[in-house]
Amino acid sequence: MAGLEDTTDLRLPSASEPIKNIVLVGRTGNGKSATGNSLIGKQVFRSETRATGVTMKCETCVAVTPCGTGINVIDTPGLFDLSVSAEYLSQEIINCLVLAEDGLHAVVLVLSVRTRISQEEEATLNTLQVIFGSQIIDYLVVLFTGGDELEANNMTLDDYLSKGCPEFLKTVLRLCGGRRILFDNRTTDEGKKVKQVQELLAHVAAIEKSTSGIPFTDEMHRKIQKEAETLREQQKEVESKDLAAAEIEKWKKHYQTEHDKNMNMMAEMLGNRLREDSERQEKMLLALRDNLEISQRQNKLNELTDNEPDLIHCGVSLRRMPCNML
């Protein structure tokens, strides 16, 4: 599993330059892990072509890009797949925020030009807004994988988007200021690898400028930060006391248990919020379906009503005709 332990042979960013926290989200199979590897410049996230996702837990890796920017890339599992339970999603969202304790500098929605954009992509944006609020769009970048396929067909990203771009995607691109980028995760061209990473970091820089350099945090994120700070202070205080090693370990374990309990409570609250939203969405879909059926029945009734006068007129005319003409 990729994680902070995988960064030992990677250059670490200097303390004077804050690390950019970049989280990758999207449907299983869209190439999140491969994109993370492209950003890091090394195979640290497991990436394979299969029906089920390889990444099962949020994973992170810190490195310095060729242009000198320190990044913390967070690879998420298929958090927003329709098959994912609210409990699993809420726990992994909490884990994701723990890995980006100082806030999110960019949320990268990973799509693929190789597959049709589905309801799951649309659900991703809705779920992000349910969890974080509408402000999360200010930090969104839409990244398309499969650049090699478009290049083989002599197509640009704009060519691809001009051919039947779903309304959902048009809305997303409009809301995030058109921040989009095409990635080729299969290229062996070192210059191309560097260029596409630089292009993504340019979008991150643009986000920083538009948000006054303030990374995204919300109430839940701030609670997580406070919990982490409290745990550090408690453990530091225990270590400063003249206690036996076993006693120190006992208190550390106690504080860690309390911390985990509070984190689980937050995950449970988030899970309840997600379930409520899911139920609301289902009710809306049922209402739309019912309204559509009512509308279709009304249209059929109107068609019959429109034809009725002609039938009545014909019947009256026949009754008034002379007998010798019948």
Swiss-Prot record:
One of its GO terms (cellular component) is endoplasmic reticulum. Pfam families: AIG1 (PF04548). Keywords: Coiled coil, GTP-binding, Nucleotide-binding. Residues 17-225 form the AIG1-type G domain. Residues 26-33 are annotated as: G1. Residues 184-186 are annotated as: G5. Residues 75-78 are annotated as: G3. Gene3D superfamilies: P-loop containing nucleotide triphosphate hydrolases. This is Immune-associated nucleotide-binding protein 4. It comes from Arabidopsis thaliana. The lineage of its organism: Eukaryota, Viridiplantae, Streptophyta, Embryophyta, Tracheophyta.
